Regions:
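C-terminal "post-core" interaction segments
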Residues: 1, 5, 9-13, 123-125, ...
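Flexible, low-complexity junctional segments that flank or bridge functional domains
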Residues: 1-187, 194-198, 215, 243, ...
């Protein structure tokens, strides 16, 4: 690598070059990275403060519109979160706990990172709030055994911003009886924006323990990101094109975040994280912008309309769960 000086201009040039040569979505997103260099390069003056430099470099990285891109110093971290702004939230924790789950002491059970319950209509429910929360095979055995007599299963991953891909694979493996192609990954092979390896297939192996055979509804909103996006894709892949659909996604498009993140360092010791390896679904379509639901539900709009009509009961309903009940009762 070129050795850039540890000064504002050197740090700017190093960061620009790392993204230019190693970030994987410049072409897919249609970003003119040379123009970005010109725009921000003229703001970086010798002798500017660390704080000002951090602001300029963060703004430059925001041009990538990628939630996996962060700049970190010892005191600050930049984070792009506009990918979910402008979408309905589609999740209300108060409604979920007050009218569906109840309390931990009397309403739902907890096993590791999973909250679970059997509703009165005999539909099972699992809430998983973060793929960073560990889930072992013993936990999954216990939960699926408890839910085994249910007519169908809801897996609620709304607001789950991701975490560990191992957990995504471990859970998805409970929903297939055979090794299944879930997608493809590519790796950068050179500094050019299109220097990628061939697409390498990714397979999901079935768990050799308890597996769920009935219908499943995944509840998603735009804040489902990274490992959650991966999980939703894996679950979609288990639907067989020539068989009746078994796994449904209800709610909104997920947030994406399919690029495998990688980290590098600037001369001043700041760290930059960025998407390095693109991930595709089993049809070789990009997953970076998120996964469309089978059934779109805008809960925010339904709640607003309920208030307008003076319908108090409507304010106790989670529209995504209610839609899932309909699908699983068919």
């Amino acid at each position: 690598e070129d050795d850039y000086a540890d000064d504002p201009v050197g740090n700017f040039e190093q960061l620009w070059k790392i993204i230019d040569e190693r970030y994987c979505f410049l072409e897919e997103k249609g970003i003119d990275w040379d123009a970005v260099h010109d725009k921000y390069g003229k703001l970086v003056k010798p002798g500017i403060s660390d704080d000002d430099l951090f602001d300029i470099l963060s703004q430059m990285l925001y041009e990538l519109k990628d939630g996996h891109v962060n700049l970190s110093s010892s005191s600050r971290i930049s984070y792009y979160d506009a990918w979910y702004q402008g979408y309905p939230w589609n999740y209300r924790e108060d409604i979920l706990y007050n009218y569906y789950l109840g309390s931990a002491s009397s309403g739902y059970r907890t096993s590791a990172g999973l909250k679970y319950k059997i509703f009165d209509n005999n539909i099972g429910y699992i809430r998983y709030e973060s793929f960073s929360a560990g889930v072992g095979d013993g936990n999954l055995d216990h939960v699926l055994d408890y839910l085994k007599l249910c007519n169908g299963l809801i897996i609620d991953v709304r607001d789950n911003g991701g975490g560990n891909l191992t957990n995504s694979t471990r859970i998805a493996a409970r929903f297939t009886n055979e090794k299944t192609l879930t997608g493809y990954i590519q790796h950068k092979t050179g500094p050019g924006h299109n220097d990628f390896s061939e697409m390498e297939p990714i397979y999901l192996e079935p768990s050799n323990s308890i597996r769920w055979q009935k219908k499943v509804v995944l509840l998603t909103n735009r804040r489902c990101y990274s490992a959650t996006n991966d999980f939703v894709n894996a679950m979609h892949s288990l639907n067989n094109d020539n068989e009746e659909q078994r796994i449904f996604q209800v709610g909104d498009q997920t947030g994406g975040g399919s690029g495998l993140p990688f980290s590098s360092e600037l001369p001043n010791g700041w760290s930059v994280r960025f998407s390095a390896s693109p991930h595709f679904n089993k049809y070789k379509k990009p997953l970076e912008n998120g996964i469309e639901p089978d059934v779109y539900v805008n809960m925010d709009k339904i709640l607003e309309e309920g208030i307008e009509h003076g319908d108090a009961e409507s304010q106790k309903k989670d529209a995504l769960i209610e839609r899932a009940f309909e699908i699983l009762s068919e």
